[in-house]
Amino acid sequence: MVLSKTASKSDDSIHSTFASRYVRNSISRFEIPKNSIPKEAAYQIINDELKFDGNPRLNLASFVTTWMEPECDKLMMESINKNNVEMDQYPVTTDLQNRCVNMIARLFNAPLGDGEAAIGVGTVGSSEAVMLAGLAFKRQWQNKRKALGLPYDRPNIVTGANIQVCLEKFARYFEVELKEVKLREGYYVMDPDKAVEMVDENTICVVAILGSTLTGEFEDVKLLNDLLVEKNKKTGWDTPIHVDAASGGFIAPFLYPDLEWDFRLPLVKSINVSGHKYGLVYAGIGWVVWRTKTDLPDELIFHINYLGADQPTFTLNFSKGSSQVIAQYYQLIRLGFEGYRNVMDNCRENMMVLRQGLEKTGRFNIVSKENGVPLVAFSLKDSSRHNEFEVAEMLRRFGWIVPAYTMPADAQHVTVLRVVIREDFSRTLAERLVADFEKVLHELDTLPARVHAKMASGKVNGVKKTPEETQREVTAYWKKFVDTKTDKNGVPLVASITNQ
């Protein structure tokens, strides 16, 4: 590569990036360097470091889209310099966002008349969308309590222990008590009966998850709605439901159209969905839509005019790129209902291929269900010598990024591996992954147990540990061990399960 800067007497080799002073010396890490460098050198230095990142296509921990068509890539690059918040300057982009909101609201069966505009907003992801929905519920609850002359300083929200961290953030940041329904082995989603039991007069809403991060399972929103209807009748309360459909919102309408989880249920007042997951758009784009205009309090909507015109806004952030909004509209009109259904069908079929391949090894228990988000969550049948964290670590050698994690309370003694099936995960990749799992298991069989042999026979005060105690101890050890393991570039060897 030839550098753009003319060579000087002090550096005759400046014409070659790899022979120049720019790669002979360490690049600045903590302070802005005093001098400029040629653009080719800057590109090459950064590009070389980025090679140590994992391959996004082989990152099976993530639900986030990692491939789009070249035509959509082109549209995104052509609009990358547009600030989405500047509605007056970019009216067409604003119109495209409104079209997306209307399409998604109708996809979720919002009670809208012909030509009636839906109520919703684009966000940077489902985390922001969940927080906006939560703020609307909190303000609605406060307004009702104030009107009745009742205390409004102790709001709570009910959900399962399988929630995404964004809901925990909402509760902590906006001072709302989080009431979690504990999980149990074999049942890794919120139990609607237990959730409704936890509802009281201070509950601003119950959050149901359509597509658990842990297992991909859809929670029973219809049963939750029916139970809440009965409780509301008995108590005189009006406890509503929010559906976190970050993963499942672009799956259920196409694969399970008869499943009632959305605005067909009267207590569902708002729904969020991630466009950058099964909406098939690169990160980060999310959406939140409300059932009716009255479900979003007017006082939460701000009006600004310093960008040239009066603009309503209800977001936690302000400036953001418009590329993802444009890409979402591209996917909606490019694929249509037929295209989305075909993509989701293919994901489900590839999930079944992987699931059956893992079952045939005879080494795994499948934890996830066949219906739901197309993923496979599974655990070792025999973890007496080696566990899931070791399997995940060794898969890295083949390029695969597969997360291993423990379940939340009260199922934290259960450890699983999880593979998310995205649009770009082919049948061939599924078959190769199964083969690589078998190679890893064969190699582990030839190795001595690194931890279990020492801990399995352990005793506490002369009393032998139960299998559950041993498993918890081993899992905690391995989680701590793997969390501290990094490659030579400081990158963790095992991906976390966070994905918004």
UniProtKB/Swiss-Prot annotation:
Enzyme class label: lyase
A biological process from GO: glutamate metabolic process
Cofactor(s) for this UniProt protein: pyridoxal 5'-phosphate
Domain of life: Eukaryota
Summary of subunit composition and partner proteins: Homohexamer. Interacts with calmodulin.
Alphabetized PANTHER family for the sequence: GLUTAMATE DECARBOXYLASE, GLUTAMATE DECARBOXYLASE 3-RELATED
Record-given protein name: Glutamate decarboxylase 3
